[in-house]
Amino acid sequence: MNLHAIAHRSLFTDCYARNEREIILNIRTGKDITGVNLLFDDPYAYGISGDIHWIGRPLPMRMERELKHNYVYTVKLTPEYRRVQYCFELFSADEVIYLYEDGFYTAESAEKKGRLKQYFKFPYLNKCDVIAPPAWAADTIWYQIMPDRFCKGSDHPKRMQHKDWEDREGITGFDFFGGDLRGIIQKLPYLKDLGITGIYLLPVFLSDTNHKYNTFDYTKIDPDFGTEEDLIELVNTAHDMGIRVMLDAVFNHSGTEFFAWQDIWEKGEDSEFFDWFVIHRKPFERKYASLRDGRFDGFAFLDNMPKLDTGNPKVQKYFGDICTYWVQKWGIDGIRFDVGNEVSHRFLQYMNRTLKTINPELFLLGEIWMDSAQWLRGDEYDSVMNYPFFESLQNFWVDEDADSRDFMYAMNRVYSLYPEQTNAVLFNHLDTHDTMRALTRCGSLDIFYHQQAVLMTLPGSPCIYYGTEIAMEGGHDPDCRKTMPWRDIEAGKFTDHQTFTKALIALRKQYPQLRDEKIVWHHDAMNPRLVCYDRPGEQETIRVYLNNTEKDIPIPADPIFTYKYENAILKANGILICRI
């Protein structure tokens, strides 16, 4: 038995509360394992005396996920008294081994006279410890908007801007196009018709950049975008249409005109706000240049985005009060935390406690590009931007030698990182303002459509970057931040793309199993790059086929969504979604 491949700890994804009554236990094994039993019971089932002989009840575990080198076995328990003690019985072709908290034992060695068995325990299921992201997020279809580039809805005076909204050549990071909040309000019917139920806005606060990630004043809407009244109208109008609103917030760093930084610039280390930032040198050096010299910290090495000390209780209190105002006065439904893995855990815990007290259903999203387990324990973020999902999709289509098993391994790894309830609200996306446009990255319309189909048929809270529904193209920033081509949209130039996206969104809404956790994978030895998976439901199962080959494949089916499927033939690079 390959003992090195076996792993379990009684925490996070290995052992957690699914809800107020259920506990999920997972164990990772090698592929030589043929079965696993959980031996479990209440820790006090036989009394509390030190001389009792505790015996666990056997319960077969289910092989839930296959990874490249491992199996993940799982079981769901509903312990009567909300606590459980346990160990594992593992079977291979020729061995039976027991796993306790202190290691592996044979049946004989485990029962040696005088041995003190170290069992795993879930001590008690406390209601307040359950990871419980807002349930509504799992049913939400998000749409990400860069306000300056989405729609220009008013003619009030604004800083320099392109004369022609349709100008998309030679865009720089310093261009302004005049998009605003009123433009977003005007296009809410368009978003509702598309099937969108949540909008995520890039920062809207006072700043001198088009992206607003160097915030000058967290209390003022940038006048280029409109007024506080415009934002309130946007939120209220969106809510009337069944659309939630999430704001982007930057707490890792501020802009140079932020009042606290300006006070430091004027007074140096005598400023009462000196400890609001991560400054390493005294006396304070008043210069703007790369931060590679280490005089103070900032975002990357940018001197116009000085890093806030989010471990400072005064900083926590200030921004807690700011966000409290946003939630109470504006009625927003979520906050996205920029550079979310560089903000202190204590800051996030403070924000979670403060804001969830006001609105327990507030959605807190972190921008993190990596395994985010340490931020998703229930007292910080509800979800993160799921870059591992995005990257795994890209890597499969880049590697033409990868087969359907490799795709399964990649997706199963993504969904093994976090608890089930977190997987349901992971912020899945194909592109953002920080990446190439999806179509440009994919390099072909077929691959782009395949990835859209995956986005809308796997667990998570999918997000469409503005323009992805019309197959907008663009390289890395700033090319991925072009204006929305409303003239061409209204002329019907992108109807085919819009119809494709709308149909997938409608499908996701119609079939709840597409939002559930369970995925069953299938593989075809004759067509190794034919991706196929089931999404089982209570009444029926939905099956997804993605033909990533250059040949036609006969598949008789009851289709509910197709692309390049005719007369029971799934053509090369086609998509088939059907009931089985």
Give the role of each language-model region.
Residues 148, 160, 377-383, 424-446, ...:
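Aromatic/acidic polysaccharide-binding cleft in carbohydrate-active enzymes
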Residues 29-31, 566-580:
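C-terminal beta-strand-rich structural cap/linker in extracellular carbohydrate-active enzymes
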Residues 146-197, 204-324, 328-329, 351-357, ...:
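Substrate-binding/active-site clefts of carbohydrate-active enzymes
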Residues 32-81, 91-105:
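Aromatic- and glycine-rich beta-strand/loop motifs that create alpha-glucan
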Residues 1-33, 110-128, 133-135:
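Non-catalytic, glycine-rich low-complexity segments
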Residues 235-243, 253, 258-269, 328, ...:
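Active-site-proximal helices and loops of the catalytic beta/alpha 8
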Residues 24, 522-557:
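Carbohydrate-binding surface patches
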